[in-house]
Amino acid sequence: MSFEITVGSADDVQRMASWANDEGWNPGNTDDHAFFAADPGAFLIGRLDGEPQACISVVKYGTGFGFLGFYIARPPVRGKGYGIQVWQAGMARLAGRNVGLDGVVAQQGNYKKSGFRLAWNNIRHEGAPPAGKPPAGVTFADARSIGFDRLAAYDRKFFPEARDSFLATWISLPERASLVALRDGEIVGFAVMRACAAASRVGPLYGATPEIASALVGALATTLGATAVAIDVPDRNKPAVKLAEQIGLKPSFETARMYTGADPDVDYAGLFGVTSLELG
């Protein structure tokens, strides 16, 4: 049998998202377009006799950071060594970088053996949030309506490197809505909600205060008509966990954020929900 690892096409990335949905990860309906825009060479497919059977994404950000996701071997080929070959090819692409990932519970021990260490846990909370309106002195605007450079600079406070190609696509795809919170002309919050096969996902979710973050979630749910939402909440930000509970969301799924190097220097206090488990 012949096993070959190649760089995936846009269609392959769509297939990877479908596999992720089979695993219960509930990616957004159109996420694959933004994923491919982030780094078109990042998506590796392992083909057994020409048939796709395993995958990994290894996105390069800037010069020093990378994020690993979509590490999947299809059930019929698990335990046969194909997944680890894809893993090794992916890690080779990110050699010399601080690499992050969000690992499912069953794989965390293996990731530690590969040099990753636990930074925090992302706890997915799901439920029906109350309607939200901006706190006093704060207004909401469509994130596409402000200068993109301003939005990208704000996003950079919470992410280790610039990700302009990804971000520009992330806010403009169909089946989603994005809002910024403004106070005295300054951005004090930003959130995106996208439709998924199950609960609509929120990410990123940034806010100068829990009240701003909460209101963004409620406003986005109203805009999209979402009856159920899901947020991957970093448990290192205790007010974020408390906020998810206060708006009626319940824990449903857990991953570990792990890095090969130091925790990135970002504004964790304003990070109420990570963007995606696949690309960070």
Feature map (PLM): residue ranges:
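Intrinsically disordered, low-complexity, positively biased terminal segments
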Residues: S2, S9-Q14, A34, R47-L48, ...
